[in-house]
Every structure is written in structure tokens, then in C-alpha cells.
Amino acid sequence: MSKEPTTADGLQNRFRTHYCGRLNRKSEGELVRIAGWVHRIRDHGGLIFIDLRDHTGICQLVVLPENESQFKLAETLHSESVISAEGKVVLRSDETVNPRLASGAIEVVVSSIQIESNADPLPFPVADDMPTSEELRLKYRFLDLRREKLHENIIFRSKLTAAVRKYLTDLDFIEIQTPILTSSSPEGARDFLVPSRLHPGKFYALPQAPQQFKQLLMVAGFPRYFQIAPCFRDEDARADRSPGEFYQIDIEMSFIEQDDLFVILEGMFKHLVENMSHKRITQFPFPRISYKDVMNRYGSDKPDLRIPLEIQDVTELFVNSGFKVFASNTAEGSCVKAMVLKGMGNESRLFYDKAEKRARELGSAGLAYIQFKEEGPKGPVVKFLSEAEMNALKERLGIVTGDVVFFGAGKWEKTCKIMGGMRNYFADLFPLDKDELSFCWIVDFPMFEYNEEDKKIDFSHNPFSMPQGEMEALESKFPLDILAYQYDIVCNGIELSSGAIRNHRPDIMYKAFEIAGYSKEEVDARFGHMIEAFKHGAPPHGGIAPGLDRLVMILRDEQNIREVIAFPMNQSAQDLMMAAPSEVTAQQLKELCIRIELPEEEK
């Protein structure tokens, strides 16, 4: 084939003129040059068929025996070898059309093959999605990334990131990169520390989030900031949390109120779901639920609203009850909660034993329940309740024959969480639609909480949030009654992000910290640079930072965060492919004035 001028799309060079997955019936008769990996190779009755794969898909090559030199060359190929091939596009016969491939109506009859790189035997097959240990997958991640599903996840992530950028820049957001080397903050998760060669004995830290920088950008007069921000936290892995590093869609705006931010975020998620996913949003605008309400109704501040169960408060029904377990938990600060499972009252004893076991795992002393059977109510607490209490329960909860009601009693927060855990436990009884995205905002978080261990008032979440009512609330309200402009966005039981309207006034900040037991000197020592900035004209501002990794997980139906990250660490925070973390040389340590002293058990 004659050499064509080089083009920006990577075609018309010596390797390819076309992409494998974009050849179709319209390509019939064309002379093409394609390149990629040998997905499969088969010898069928003297014909060699090669499935050639590039990032667009797969195309079938046919090597005829009369093309003797190329036939012999094809016989030497291994799976995952890299080749380029020239040939003519022909239509397949009707009986050999492969409808699963975009190029399934055609094949390329090969005139020549060039081996660019022959592959050694593989540690696991790429073409077949057979189960492979995670250790092997991570060690050979470059092979694992060739597998179709993982490959598509990474491409999807790229497209999603591009869509986020376009959505936000169209709304006049400015993308600004913040420092990766910054100062350490002992609050929150552990920092990753970076020793300074130029300043012996001192350390930088990788940012846990660009929080302070993005607020300083508001002070600097940038009205709308965003960044696809890398964040670093030295914390243990979970299925939805990668150890060490993760990415967030970091957003901050000045001169806004809480509702302004909600409108922009809801619009962004709606745009992403409608344009990049087959999933559907259950309710738009997203429902807003106060922290107190969400704990009372769902027992969690990250509820899965698809679960058709709701916790109900029945405390007042047992104020004068003869059943002391309930009656003793009717005073302020305690409660009696109930949850009805409709039509589940005739389950086996094993069902209730397993439920009680789960309740104990959640911290309960047991699990009280009543089955409403044809022959009358049954269960371990029936004998302790009066007929009037039973009737009041049935009326309050809408109970009919065939239902079962579960109870929890104790301190309000603990009881809510136990009942919320049981709600999640019973979720498996219901066919939840994985294509339904049930977003919600959790709002009106308490500003302060009582720290039982230290016997003092402490911040409940973000100490830099603006209290609702501002200075007046701090000066006139009981601390535990003060609410903050803090909010979480949740989808299907997964917290995507926390955010807040920030406290931009030093006087309010000093007062809030004073309530939590900090002196002005302590606040200045820890956060002096922020307060100094706020003293020079800080606008009202607020923000949020949805997790990019978790968002991709939800939209791609993945249960493990490592399935949406190109090069993740394992559960032990190790990169098996790059052998990190690793030892360094004595000279490197000497330059940094560092000496290693391992714990006794590791020596």
C-alpha cells in the first residue's frame, strides 16, 4: 500500500489505516492496514483465523494457505502478540456473520503480516474472562487492563471525567491545580509524609484534600473553582475505598447558599446519568432529609431509599408499660423503635435466629419481635405486653395478619443505628433495582456532639462549617441544639460526598472553637494562615467534593473500587506490579537525614 500523509487520528501511518472495530459492510473491497493484539488464533481446516483486537474492538483476519510465507508466520503467533496486517475487506457468508461484533459482517483476507512484538506464555488468559486471583491480576495489571470489562471501565472513567469538565466549565467554573506537596495536619486520617532534603528534619505531606487551598482561592477572588483532585490518606482499604489514593470532583463557589450548590450538583449528576448511563434517577430534584429525620426513619445517614422498609418510633406507646425493657427507654434521650416486615410473619425459626444473630453483631442485647399469625400474636415479648398495647401497635403501624414487627430499645443514636443495620440486613428480601439511582441530600447535621470518652462538647463533623444562625446561635443556644450548614449526598446507600457552607468569619470561628474547648491561641497555632486570610476580606462560600471512583463504581455496577482504577493497590496498600512500597538505598536515607528503626517484631 502506498504511504499516505500522516494524520492526527493516528491513521495512515505504517501500522494502520483503519481501526479493527470500525470496519463494517461499508468497508467491503477496501485495502486496509490494521494493528493490535492477537486475541485468539484458530486453525480451521487449513485456514488460520486471527481475531485481532485494538481499543475499538475485534476484527477477524483470514490467512489462506496459498499465501505460504504469511501462513507459516501466522503459525508462530501466540495469544497477545502484537502484529500489523494488510489485506482486503470481504463480506462473510451469512452463516458465519458474528452479530456480537461491530465488525462481525466482514473479515480481512491477509496479504501480509508484520510481527511487532511476540508474546511469552501468559500468566492468565486475556481473551477469556475466567476467574483469576486478585494477586495475579494486580501483579500483571497491564494484562488485566486488556480484558474487555476492565478496559471499558477505564475508558468510561475518562469519558465521565471529560463530561464533568465540560459541564462545569460551561457554568463558568475555573479548573485550578492545587499543590501536591503541602503541610501536615494531625487531624483526621493519617498523612503520607514526604521528607525534605533541603530542610532536614522537616516534612511535607500529600494532601488529604485540597480543602484549605480551594477556600483560599475563594478569598483570592475566583468565584467558581473545580479540580479532578488526587487525594492521599494513609488508611485501610475497603471495597469502596482505595488505600492511599483516590480522586474527587472538587468544587467550591463563593457568594452562594446551600440551595445554589444543590441545584448545580443535581444538574451535574442528571447530565451524567442521562448521557452516559442506562440507569435512571428515581426522584428529581433529589429529596432532602434532615439528619434527625434520616436517623429516625432509616437508622443511617447514608440510607438506601430503594429498600421498602422504614423505622417508626413507638416510644410513647410504652411510657406506662409493664414491660420494663421498653418502659425504661421512654425517657428523653432513649427510644423504642419498630420496623414492620409485611407478609413475613410466617418465616421459619431459623429466619429469626439469623436475624437475632445479626442484631447482636450490631451491638444489640437481642432482638424482640412479634409475629401476627392467624391464631394470634407470637414471639418472645408477647407475654409482656397488654392487649391495649398490642392494639395500639397494630393501629400505629398498620399491622395485619401475616406481618412481623421487630423492635429496638435504648439510647436514641445507638438504637437508630442498630435498627438501620437490621434494615440493611433485611434488604436482601427485596428485589432492589440496580438501574434505579435513589439520590438524596442529608442536611441539618448537628454542629456539636457530646464526647462521652472525654466528657466534653466536641465538633460532630466539620469544625469549619457555618452554624445555622451564625453568631447568634452560638451565643444563645445550647450547643447540642445548634445545627450546621453541612450536607451529604448519598446514592443507593453510598455516601458520594460531604460538603458545607464554610465559616468565613474569624469571630464566629473563634466562638465555635471556644465551645469545643479550644483557646484562641490554640486556634491561631493550628489554623492561623486560614484565619489570617479571612481577616483580609473573605466572601461567603461553600463546596463539595463527590468521589470520582465511587461515582464510576455506581454507574458501572462494580462492587470493588479496584475495578474502576487503572493501577490500584491491594488490600494491604501494596502495588504488586511496581513492588511498592520498597526499600531505598542508604545514600538516599542519608541525604534526608533519616534512620530506620523497625519495631522489634519486624527486625
UniProtKB/Swiss-Prot annotation:
<dbReference type="InterPro" id="IPR047090">
    <property type="entry name" value="AspRS_core"/>
</dbReference>
<dbReference type="InterPro" id="IPR029351">
    <property type="entry name" value="GAD_dom"/>
</dbReference>
<feature type="binding site">
    <location>
        <position position="502"/>
    </location>
    <ligand>
        <name>L-aspartate</name>
    </ligand>
</feature>
<comment type="similarity">
    <text>Belongs to the class-II aminoacyl-tRNA synthetase family. Type 1 subfamily.</text>
</comment>
<dbReference type="GO" id="GO:0005737">
    <property type="term" value="C:cytoplasm"/>
</dbReference>
<dbReference type="GO" id="GO:0005524">
    <property type="term" value="F:ATP binding"/>
</dbReference>
<dbReference type="InterPro" id="IPR006195">
    <property type="entry name" value="aa-tRNA-synth_II"/>
</dbReference>
<feature type="binding site">
    <location>
        <position position="495"/>
    </location>
    <ligand>
        <name>ATP</name>
    </ligand>
</feature>
<comment type="function">
    <text>Aspartyl-tRNA synthetase with relaxed tRNA specificity since it is able to aspartylate not only its cognate tRNA(Asp) but also tRNA(Asn). Reaction proceeds in two steps: L-aspartate is first activated by ATP to form Asp-AMP and then transferred to the acceptor end of tRNA(Asp/Asn).</text>
</comment>
<keyword id="KW-0030">Aminoacyl-tRNA synthetase</keyword>
<keyword id="KW-0547">Nucleotide-binding</keyword>
<dbReference type="Pfam" id="PF00152">
    <property type="entry name" value="tRNA-synt_2"/>
</dbReference>
<feature type="binding site">
    <location>
        <position position="233"/>
    </location>
    <ligand>
        <name>L-aspartate</name>
    </ligand>
</feature>
<dbReference type="GO" id="GO:0006422">
    <property type="term" value="P:aspartyl-tRNA aminoacylation"/>
</dbReference>
<feature type="binding site">
    <location>
        <position position="461"/>
    </location>
    <ligand>
        <name>L-aspartate</name>
    </ligand>
</feature>
<keyword id="KW-0963">Cytoplasm</keyword>
<dbReference type="InterPro" id="IPR004364">
    <property type="entry name" value="Aa-tRNA-synt_II"/>
</dbReference>
<dbReference type="InterPro" id="IPR002312">
    <property type="entry name" value="Asp/Asn-tRNA-synth_IIb"/>
</dbReference>
<keyword id="KW-0067">ATP-binding</keyword>
<dbReference type="GO" id="GO:0050560">
    <property type="term" value="F:aspartate-tRNA(Asn) ligase activity"/>
</dbReference>
<dbReference type="Pfam" id="PF02938">
    <property type="entry name" value="GAD"/>
</dbReference>
<feature type="site" description="Important for tRNA non-discrimination">
    <location>
        <position position="44"/>
    </location>
</feature>
<protein>
    <recommendedName>
        <fullName>Aspartate--tRNA(Asp/Asn) ligase</fullName>
        <ecNumber>6.1.1.23</ecNumber>
    </recommendedName>
</protein>
<feature type="region of interest" description="Aspartate">
    <location>
        <begin position="211"/>
        <end position="214"/>
    </location>
</feature>
<comment type="subunit">
    <text>Homodimer.</text>
</comment>
<dbReference type="InterPro" id="IPR045864">
    <property type="entry name" value="aa-tRNA-synth_II/BPL/LPL"/>
</dbReference>
<keyword id="KW-0648">Protein biosynthesis</keyword>
<feature type="binding site">
    <location>
        <begin position="233"/>
        <end position="235"/>
    </location>
    <ligand>
        <name>ATP</name>
    </ligand>
</feature>
<dbReference type="Pfam" id="PF01336">
    <property type="entry name" value="tRNA_anti-codon"/>
</dbReference>
<dbReference type="InterPro" id="IPR012340">
    <property type="entry name" value="NA-bd_OB-fold"/>
</dbReference>
<feature type="binding site">
    <location>
        <begin position="547"/>
        <end position="550"/>
    </location>
    <ligand>
        <name>ATP</name>
    </ligand>
</feature>
<dbReference type="InterPro" id="IPR004115">
    <property type="entry name" value="GAD-like_sf"/>
</dbReference>
<dbReference type="GO" id="GO:0004815">
    <property type="term" value="F:aspartate-tRNA ligase activity"/>
</dbReference>
<dbReference type="GO" id="GO:0003676">
    <property type="term" value="F:nucleic acid binding"/>
</dbReference>
<dbReference type="InterPro" id="IPR004365">
    <property type="entry name" value="NA-bd_OB_tRNA"/>
</dbReference>
<feature type="binding site">
    <location>
        <position position="187"/>
    </location>
    <ligand>
        <name>L-aspartate</name>
    </ligand>
</feature>
<keyword id="KW-0436">Ligase</keyword>
<dbReference type="InterPro" id="IPR047089">
    <property type="entry name" value="Asp-tRNA-ligase_1_N"/>
</dbReference>
<dbReference type="InterPro" id="IPR004524">
    <property type="entry name" value="Asp-tRNA-ligase_1"/>
</dbReference>
